[in-house]
Amino acid sequence: SVVVDTNGQPVSNGADAYYLVPVSHGHAGLALAKIGNEAEPRAVVLDPHHRPGLPVRFESPLRINIIKESYFLNIKFGPSSSDSGVWDVIQQDPIGLAVKVTDTKSLLGPFKVEKEGEGYKIVYYPERGQTGLDIGLVHRNDKYYLAVKDGEPCVFKIRKATDE
């Protein structure tokens, strides 16, 4: 089925930016943070000091204007023309399988957006044929890192970034 935003409108394929609003951590937005002594902040976190946070785009190579739950997606920060800020999942202690931004994207992204409760969860597929793994939150150092936590997804509502 079609993924819809908080206005009930279909989420667009790459054209629009959206805020991911966590259902259970409503006063936090997406931001970037460091893990350990990294030179640059590349880990995706929910930060209570960042609202509404960094907007994301959902991109599928399919020539269709809207996003459906069955589609493999790239999720990324930044403009659609750029390949920076693309989400991936990378093993990094002490977080585990952490969501981090990279400068490369595969044609078919490794994520799907799937209905969960009153919102949507992000599901990571390490391989096409494998079972998906829920993206949840790992709490460290006053931040909530997005990471694989299967069975404990973080549920988001998707709000179009132009709707202030």
Swiss-Prot record:
Q: Name one GO molecular function term.
A: serine-type endopeptidase inhibitor activity
Protein location? Secreted
**GO terms for CC?**
extracellular region
- What cystine linkages occur within this chain? none
Q: How does activity depend on temperature?
A: Thermolabile.
Domain of life of the organism encoding this protein: Eukaryota
SUPFAM superfamilies per UniProt: STI-like (SSF50386)
Name the InterPro entries on file. Answer: Kunitz_inhibitor_STI-like_sf, Prot_inh_Kunz-lg
Report the principal subcellular site.
secreted
UniProt keywords (A-Z) are:
Protease inhibitor, Secreted, Serine protease inhibitor
Q: What does the sequence similarity comment in the record state about its family?
A: Belongs to the protease inhibitor I3 (leguminous Kunitz-type inhibitor) family.
Could you give the subunit structure recorded for this chain?
A: Monomer.
- Function statement: Inhibits bovine trypsin, human plasma kallikrein and plasmin and weakly bovine chymotrypsin.
What is the recorded name of this protein? Kunitz-type serine protease inhibitor BbKI
Its source organism is: Bauhinia bauhinioides
